[in-house]
Amino acid sequence: MLMPKKVKYRKQQRGRMRGKAWRGSELSFGDYGLKVMECGYITDRQIEASRIAMTRFIKRGGKIWLRLFPDKPITKKPAETRMGKGKGAPDHWVAVVRPGKVLFEMEGVSPEMAQEAMRLAANKLPLKTRFVMRHDVKTTVAAK
């Protein structure tokens, strides 16, 4: 699973998710991408499940980039524990995403194959997503 090698503080406060993503909202590496449309948390397991689903579908056809990393620890107290006695132990890691953030990018495959691979990945995620294409790829596909 994805997680930071070392962190300054083991536990973090929850924080608030407001506004849109102002970084990471454009395609940077590939020709196709999966953009999230609402804010929320994506766990390390969900990221890995999405990555495996895409990789299995395209086999060795193209290249995939992950544009998010789970860097926020989520704590959990043991079951049947009374309230109080401090914050729970770190349980898993999540990536905080806001609307407009590109989660995955892909290149080296046809648009139909990329869209299907992204659909399979989106089924593993808890948030609404949208398939996006680079502008110059759209014009090339339309010209054919």
From Swiss-Prot:
GO biological process: translation
Molecular function, one GO term: rRNA binding
Key word Ribonucleoprotein present: yes
Protein keywords: Ribonucleoprotein, Ribosomal protein, RNA-binding, rRNA-binding, tRNA-binding
UniProt cross-references to InterPro entries, sorted A to Z: Ribosomal_uL16, Ribosomal_uL16_bact-type, Ribosomal_uL16_CS, Ribosomal_uL16_dom, Ribosomal_uL16_sf
An example Gene Ontology CC term for this record: cytosolic large ribosomal subunit
SUPFAM superfamilies documented for this protein: Ribosomal protein L16p/L10e (SSF54686)
A Pfam family the protein falls into: Ribosomal_L16
Subunit relationships: Part of the 50S ribosomal subunit.
Purpose: Binds 23S rRNA and is also seen to make contacts with the A and possibly P site tRNAs.
Family listed: Belongs to the universal ribosomal protein uL16 family.
Protein name per UniProt: Large ribosomal subunit protein uL16
Gene from which this protein is expressed: rplP
